From Swiss-Prot:
Family annotation (InterPro entries): DFDF (IPR025762), FDF_dom (IPR019050), FFD_box (IPR025761), Lsm14-like_N (IPR025609), LSM_dom_sf (IPR010920), Sm (IPR047575), TFG_box (IPR025768)
Phylogenetic placement of the source organism: Eukaryota, Metazoa, Chordata, Craniata, Vertebrata
Pfam families for this protein: FDF, LSM14
Region described as Disordered: 160-241, 268-312, 352-380
Locus of motif TFG box: 325-345
PANTHER family the UniProt entry points to: PROTEIN LSM14 HOMOLOG B, SCD6 PROTEIN-RELATED
Keywords attached to this entry: Developmental protein, Ribonucleoprotein, Translation regulation
Residue numbers covered by motif FFD box: 307-323
Name of this chain's protein: Protein LSM14 homolog B-B
Length: 380
């Protein structure tokens, strides 16, 4: 080095074994780990020095870089530390810093590199010994991984100095209220943690949920009103509905019926005998007297075959007539109608009476009957 004593806060020009020159403010020298820390560092590249890997200069300014002592080739003091108005020699004072030099500091928002003090604070601590710096934690830096280099251990990259002022102004405008008044009271590498308020996204989410709740309540009220109107409606459930795939084919259906077989079947049921017709008084096959049960079997004649009228057995007589011989029973007529016209449709109940008296949508017939009954009893 050009001088025998290192100056904390002075501007240092450092050349590494890779022939790359760095300029920055001397921050601290760690004798135990053999490292040198520079603040506000800028790389000027190899600058025509002989090397296998030439590097161009860079415009980025790093907050600090810790260099390994074994990889440093040369160190030169460019500028001595700036003079600061030190206090009187008082053994009670351990460390001090000027607030006027850091006037821009209150507007700076929270930064992950807040542990690195400013240049003015470095100048104020130029007379501190290495023991005081170690006891106050000045030699500790947050471990931030950067690109590998044989002489650079840690580095913090920031933007160019021209863009930093604009970014600070923009961040100061958009910074939270609780963070605008934060300022650093000394070069401490590990300051007290800040009580940062939680992000406003969950709060906005809860506000949106509260704004959405009234429409849900309205929808619930609408449902209750609809239920009160139609709660007495009879539910019509269709059981075993018959599905027709196509139109009915009358020709194929008529082809299945044989007229002669049907006539023969009806004659057998009615006990008609074409060959030997019975007498008028002995006609046993009177369909009017003979009735069929639900199974279609003819019941026995309550009167005798030769008894025309018996008062004790039946009110009806057994006198044959042309109308009685042609008349069929209800079971046969129902079967004949089913074969001719098909299955009749089901009667759906409850269609004309909707809602009853509570819903107010019922038919007018029950109300008319109610008014007539009240008029008859004399009630109003």
């Amino acid at each position: 080095m050009s001088s025998g004593t290192p100056y904390i806060g002075s501007k240092i020009s450092l050349i590494s074994k890779a022939q790359i020159r760095y300029e920055g403010i001397l921050y601290t020298i760690d004798t135990e780990n053999s490292t040198v820390a520079l603040a506000k560092v800028r790389s000027f590249g190899t600058e025509d020095r002989p090397t296998d890997r030439p590097a161009p200069p860079r415009e980025e300014v790093y907050e600090y870089i810790i260099f390994r002592g074994s990889d440093i080739k040369d160190i030169t003091v460019c500028e001595p530390p700036k003079a600061s108005h030190a206090l009187s020699q008082d053994p009670a004072i351990v460390q001090s810093s000027l607030g006027s030099a850091a006037s821009y500091q209150p507007s700076v928002p929270y930064s992950p590199f807040r542990g690195m003090p400013t240049y003015s604070q470095l100048a104020a601590t130029s007379l501190l010994s290495q023991q005081y710096a170690a006891s106050l934690g000045l030699a500790g830096f947050p471990s931030i991984p950067v690109r590998k280099s044989p002489m650079v251990e840690q580095a913090v990259q920031t933007g160019p100095l021209e863009n930093q002022a604009q970014k600070k102004v923009q961040q100061a405008k958009g910074a939270p209220v609780g963070l605008r008044g934060v300022r650093q009271s000394g070069p401490q590498s590990q300051p007290a943690p800040l009580n940062v308020p939680p992000p406003a996204a969950p709060v906005l989410g809860t506000v949106n949920d509260e704004n959405r709740r009234p429409p849900r309540r309205r929808s619930g009220n609408r449902r209750t009103r609809n239920r009160s109107r139609g709660q007495n409606r009879p539910t019509t459930v269709k059981e075993n509905a018959i599905k027709f795939e196509g139109d009915f084919d009358f020709e194929s259906a008529n082809a299945q019926f044989n007229r002669e077989e049907l006539d023969k079947e009806f004659k057998d049921k009615l006990n008609f005998k074409d060959d030997k017709p019975e007498k008028a008084g002995e006609e046993k096959t009177d369909s009017g007297v003979e009735t069929q049960n639900s199974d279609g079997n003819p019941e026995e004649d309550p009167l005798g075959p030769n008894t025309y009228y018996d008062r004790s057995k039946s009110f009806f007589d057994n006198i044959s007539s042309e109308m009685k011989s042609r008349r069929t029973t209800w079971a046969e007529e129902r079967k004949l109608n089913t074969e001719t016209f098909g299955v009749s449709g089901r009667f759906l109940r409850g269609r004309s009476f909707r809602g009853g008296f509570r819903g107010g949508r019922g038919s007018a017939a029950p109300r008319r009957n109610q008014t007539t009954q009240r008029a008859g009893t004399g009630r109003v």
